[in-house]
């Protein structure tokens, strides 16, 4: 996650070190993912424009507009870049995710579904909701540090995961 953080933080600092990263509209140089690798983070991104081909656990996926991809730390991912594209999303460390207020009984079916099928289409409405969540989290990240800033982001992250659960 630290290498990904270095690529992304230049444009989207969160102030939360390597635990929470916002992936802005333009994906970073995908050179880091040119070869199969693991990302020690939960990464959820949605394609706003363009397309990208990636392999997750040796299975190829074509990501196009209004598609979400969720990568878990156990996965082996490889990205093949195709033309212009815009993505928006987050990368969350395992430590940050473990601190969230998610009920494991609710998340196990979601986790199993993501492992089975990490890419899925979203409606325009769900795409907008996801982007609004990320925008709000980004706004909070750019505010001055407060005693409850991390707790606020944890709860928004939890709410986002529940929304993803309802969506898929």
Name these PLM-found stretches:
Residues 32-35, 119, 147:
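Jelly-roll (double-stranded beta-helix
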Residues 63-76, 91:
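Conserved metal-binding segment of the jelly-roll/cupin
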Residues 1-62:
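Generic protein-terminus/edge-of-domain signal
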Residues 53-55, 71, 76-82:
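Short beta-strand His + acidic residue motifs that chelate non-heme Fe in jelly-roll/DSBH
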Residues 60-62, 69, 86, 96:
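Short, surface-exposed beta-strand-loop junctions and turns on beta-sheet-rich folds
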Residues 125-168:
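An amphipathic alpha-helical interaction segment
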């Amino acid at each position: 996650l630290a290498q990904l953080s270095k690529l992304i933080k230049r444009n989207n600092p969160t102030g939360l070190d390597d635990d929470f990263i916002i992936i802005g509209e333009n994906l970073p140089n995908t050179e880091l993912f040119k070869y199969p690798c693991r990302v020690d983070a939960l990464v959820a991104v949605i394609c706003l424009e363009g397309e990208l081909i990636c392999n997750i656990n040796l299975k190829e996926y074509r990501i196009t507009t209004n598609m979400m991809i969720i990568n878990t730390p156990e996965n082996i991912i490889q990205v093949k870049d195709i033309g212009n594209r815009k993505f928006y999303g987050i990368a969350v460390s395992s430590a940050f995710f473990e601190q969230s207020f998610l009920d494991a009984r609710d998340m196990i079916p979601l986790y199993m579904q993501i492992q089975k099928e990490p890419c899925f289409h979203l409606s325009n409405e769900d795409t907008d909701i996801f982007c609004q969540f990320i925008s709000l989290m980004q706004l909070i990240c750019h505010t001055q540090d407060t005693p409850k800033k991390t707790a606020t982001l944890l709860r928004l992250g939890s709410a986002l995961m529940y929304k993803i659960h309802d969506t898929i």
